[in-house]
Amino acid sequence: MNLKSIIFVLFIAFFAFSLANDDDPTCPNGFICFWVGQNYTGDQWKWTPRMNYRDLPRQYHNNVGSYVAKTNACFKNWIPYLTFECNEGDSSHSFTFGKIIDGVSHEC
Protein backbone atom coordinates (compact mmCIF):
# COMPACT_ATOMS: atom_id res chain seq x y z
CA MET A 1 0.00 0.00 0.00
CA ASN A 2 1.48 3.35 -0.98
CA LEU A 3 1.27 6.59 0.98
CA LYS A 4 -1.59 8.00 -1.13
CA SER A 5 -3.69 4.89 -0.47
CA ILE A 6 -3.03 5.07 3.27
CA ILE A 7 -3.98 8.76 3.39
CA PHE A 8 -7.14 8.05 1.39
CA VAL A 9 -8.18 5.21 3.73
CA LEU A 10 -7.53 7.38 6.80
CA PHE A 11 -9.55 10.24 5.28
CA ILE A 12 -12.52 7.94 4.54
CA ALA A 13 -12.34 6.40 8.03
CA PHE A 14 -12.23 9.86 9.67
CA PHE A 15 -15.14 11.11 7.54
CA ALA A 16 -17.28 8.05 8.35
CA PHE A 17 -16.48 8.34 12.08
CA SER A 18 -17.38 12.05 12.05
CA LEU A 19 -20.76 11.36 10.44
CA ALA A 20 -21.55 8.58 12.90
CA ASN A 21 -20.81 10.80 15.91
CA ASP A 22 -22.36 14.08 14.77
CA ASP A 23 -25.47 14.76 16.89
CA ASP A 24 -26.42 18.06 15.36
CA PRO A 25 -24.24 21.13 15.50
CA THR A 26 -27.30 23.41 15.42
CA CYS A 27 -28.20 22.56 19.05
CA PRO A 28 -26.49 25.14 21.29
CA ASN A 29 -24.90 24.37 24.64
CA GLY A 30 -27.37 24.56 27.53
CA PHE A 31 -30.37 23.45 25.45
CA ILE A 32 -32.35 20.34 24.58
CA CYS A 33 -33.23 20.26 20.89
CA PHE A 34 -36.24 18.26 19.71
CA TRP A 35 -37.05 17.30 16.13
CA VAL A 36 -40.36 15.96 14.85
CA GLY A 37 -38.53 13.62 12.49
CA GLN A 38 -36.16 10.80 13.19
CA ASN A 39 -32.47 11.34 12.46
CA TYR A 40 -32.71 15.01 13.52
CA THR A 41 -34.96 16.02 10.63
CA GLY A 42 -38.02 18.23 10.32
CA ASP A 43 -38.94 21.17 12.49
CA GLN A 44 -36.86 21.82 15.60
CA TRP A 45 -37.86 23.20 19.02
CA LYS A 46 -35.35 24.20 21.70
CA TRP A 47 -35.80 24.12 25.48
CA THR A 48 -33.52 25.46 28.21
CA PRO A 49 -33.75 24.96 32.02
CA ARG A 50 -34.48 28.69 32.42
CA MET A 51 -37.91 27.91 30.93
CA ASN A 52 -38.73 25.62 33.92
CA TYR A 53 -41.54 23.19 33.00
CA ARG A 54 -43.02 23.56 29.53
CA ASP A 55 -45.61 21.60 27.66
CA LEU A 56 -44.21 20.80 24.26
CA PRO A 57 -45.68 22.82 21.39
CA ARG A 58 -48.67 21.14 19.75
CA GLN A 59 -46.75 19.69 16.78
CA TYR A 60 -44.21 18.05 19.16
CA HIS A 61 -46.74 16.69 21.67
CA ASN A 62 -46.47 12.88 21.39
CA ASN A 63 -44.48 13.48 18.22
CA VAL A 64 -40.74 13.82 18.93
CA GLY A 65 -38.69 11.72 16.55
CA SER A 66 -35.22 12.62 17.83
CA TYR A 67 -33.41 14.84 20.32
CA VAL A 68 -29.99 16.08 21.42
CA ALA A 69 -29.34 17.07 25.05
CA LYS A 70 -26.76 19.70 25.82
CA THR A 71 -28.09 20.06 29.38
CA ASN A 72 -29.90 17.86 31.93
CA ALA A 73 -33.70 17.59 31.85
CA CYS A 74 -36.70 15.43 32.65
CA PHE A 75 -39.16 14.47 29.92
CA LYS A 76 -42.70 13.90 31.18
CA ASN A 77 -45.82 12.07 30.13
CA TRP A 78 -48.86 12.84 32.30
CA ILE A 79 -51.33 9.98 31.68
CA PRO A 80 -50.03 7.56 32.75
CA TYR A 81 -47.43 9.51 34.70
CA LEU A 82 -44.00 8.53 33.37
CA THR A 83 -40.68 10.35 33.36
CA PHE A 84 -37.53 9.98 31.30
CA GLU A 85 -34.39 11.42 32.87
CA CYS A 86 -32.13 13.00 30.29
CA ASN A 87 -28.49 13.91 30.89
CA GLU A 88 -26.20 16.28 29.05
CA GLY A 89 -24.66 14.41 26.14
CA ASP A 90 -27.66 12.11 25.61
CA SER A 91 -29.26 11.89 22.19
CA SER A 92 -31.52 9.64 20.18
CA HIS A 93 -32.01 9.57 16.44
CA SER A 94 -35.17 7.44 16.93
CA PHE A 95 -36.74 8.43 20.26
CA THR A 96 -39.30 5.90 21.56
CA PHE A 97 -40.45 8.04 24.54
CA GLY A 98 -41.09 10.79 21.98
CA LYS A 99 -44.31 9.00 21.02
CA ILE A 100 -45.80 9.83 24.46
CA ILE A 101 -43.89 12.96 25.58
CA ASP A 102 -46.02 15.82 26.90
CA GLY A 103 -43.49 18.19 28.44
CA VAL A 104 -39.99 18.89 29.65
CA SER A 105 -38.71 20.18 33.00
CA HIS A 106 -35.45 20.92 34.77
CA GLU A 107 -36.27 18.25 37.39
CA CYS A 108 -38.18 14.97 37.65
UniProtKB/Swiss-Prot annotation:
The family this protein is said to belong to: Belongs to the Dictyostelium gerABC family.
A Pfam family that the UniProt record links to this protein: Inhibitor_I36
A GO cellular-component term linked to this record: extracellular region
Signal sequence range: 1-20
Main location: secreted
Name of the molecule in the record: Uncharacterized gerABC family protein DDB_G0291103
Location(s), subcellular: Secreted
